[in-house]
Each structure stands twice: as C-alpha cells, then as structure tokens.
Amino acid sequence: MLPPQFRFWLFDQMSVKTMRYVSAIPDRQAEGLTKKVYDMIREDFFRNGSLTSRSKVPELMAAIWIAGRESMLVADKVDRTSKDAICAVLSQINDCPYCEDMLVSLVHASGEHKAAEDIFGQNDLDSTDPKLRDRLEWVRAIATPGAENVPPSPFSKAQMPEILGTLLAMSDINRFSHVVMDDSPVSAPFGVKAGKALQLRLFGSELVPTRRLPLQLGRSLSLLPQADLPEDLAWAEPNPRIADAVARYAAAVEREAASVISLQVRQVVAQSLATWQGEQMPISRSWVEGDLIGLTGEDLNIARLAIVLAKAPYQVDGTLAEAVLGHERDEARFVRILAWASFVGSRRFVNLIARQSAQESSQSFTRPPIDTKQHAAELAS
C-alpha cells in the first residue's frame, strides 16, 4: 500500500487527469469555504474530480458534498457497501465511466469483490450476496429508461430517504461528470477489459483507508445555511438529517442558478421534465427541439443542454457543452448552469422513483401516471 500522503496526492492528480471545460482550484490556493470543503473531503473521503470540478463556485461544491456525504457515505439506515454498489450500477446506466470506475473500486475496497466484478462485467449478479443482489437488481430496473415490471423496493420506509438521497446525489454527479470528465483515468491496457478489472481491484485496495466508518452524522450540514425543503422533495422528511441536507443542497443550486439562468429557461425546462415519465428517448437528438420553441441565443443553448442532460445524458456531447460555455470560457458561470441542469434532471428522476415507491404493492408495477401540471409548477418554483 502506498504511503498516505503520496496516495492522496496521486488520487487527486489522477482524478483531474481527464477534466475538461473546467479546472479545480489547487489545494494551495484554497481559502474560505473552498478550504473548509477540501479539508472535510480529505478527512472523510478523498479528493476527486467529481467534487472538485465545482470548486470555482464553492457553494455548489459544498452543496454536492453535503448531499453526497450525508446520503451516500454516512452509514445510517443503510450500509455504506450497498450504497457504493448502488451508485456503481447507477453510474453505469447513466454512462459516466469516470464515476463507474471509482465506485467499482470502492466496492472492491469494501471486500465485496464478487459484486464489484459482476457490476463491472455487467453480469447477472448471481454470485453476489443475495441481499445485495436484490438491491442492485432493483436499482438496475428502476434506473433503466423505459423499464417495466420493476420489482418492489427492497428497502424499508425508514431506509428510503437515505436511498433516494443517494440516487439524487449520484445522478447529479453522474450528469455533471459526464460533461466535465472525458472518460475515466483508468484505461484498459491494450483494450483488454480483464486488465482494467485488475487495475480497479488494485485501486480498491488503496481506497480501503478512505472508508472511515462510522462517519459523524450531519457533520457537513453547517457548511451551508438552513433552508426549507421543497414540497416535491418531501420524500426526505422521514429522516430529518437527509431532509436538512437535501434542503440546503437544493437551495444552493437554485440560488446560484438564478444569476445566470433566465426564468423563461427554468419554466421551459420544468414543463419538459414534467411530461417525462422516464422513458427511453429516440436516438436522434431532434426530439428536444419541439420543447425549445420561442427560445433564442444563450437561453436556447442552456435549455437544450438541460433537457438532454436530464432525459438522455448519453446524448450530451461537446457541441452542447461548448455552446453553453461560449467564447468567454467563464468557468464559474458554466459550473452554475451545469450544476442546475444536472440537479433538475436528477430531481425529476428521483421524484418518479419516490412516487412509485409510495404507491407500490407487493406485486410488480410499472410507472404510474404523474400530474404533469402540478409537477411543472413544483419544478419551476
């Protein structure tokens, strides 16, 4: 195992190797809120590009750290290994190779090597622990666009806020990282997938010390001010800590977005997402154009990126990102826009799951109809 100081330096350097469009504030230049967040990430996890890519807007880095730490990393009602594995599966479905590789390595770090290998190989999970297998099969079904006959949730009512918070934060990170990370820093040597699988297992062995269990509940909350929980995120209420984290996170994203995204764009995106039931989108990206009528200039570019990133993140390419980034290359502005776009898409995705879970019976179910007018009002508020 590598010496601790060198290990964390290496992790940080590797994590920004494929970063594009934005850059992370160097550790030696960090001050104020940026330094507070950097220090807490280092103490409770490890610095990596999925978090530091938002450092040009410290409040947004703090927001995603609060949401991720309190939902994903803290072992409260659900164990950390299950959440790492769930996030690995979700990252795979959301087409975020950077996130997928890091999370598969974290599953290795937990000692669940068979689960990590099954997830990486997109296998049927037969060799995975039965309890974990049920959880991963549910996530695979619930997160796959257009999925039908989704099995009942394997989580209790007390566990659901933590799981939904995990899915919200990870989906946001997936979408954001899909844009700002150009693939994974871990490559398959000579194109041999087995070689990459071995690298991820070795990387996992170096990540073992980062699994500092148990983490103090609620430690990150004070990084941002208190906020009211939006009505459509009421699924978090049964766990006050998760509700507090989600409220602060949502408020920060909306607050930072307000200075760079027009009300018209927010309304157009809200209406588009309110009619989306999680279905698979057509291969051609022309499906989005009908939702953009009446928009021009930067409003058009921002709305297009947000809607595609929400419904089909795998269809987002450099042309969409470059159109929003513009000639001025204002990284802070881009982070504000992208953080909002990633959040609203993830919010819709998780709210669909929350409503399904609330209505499910002991039988398999398909996605129920949603009151689209009500949800549009919630998203636009």
Give residue ranges: language-model regions.
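Hydrophobic alpha-helical segments
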Residues: M1-S381
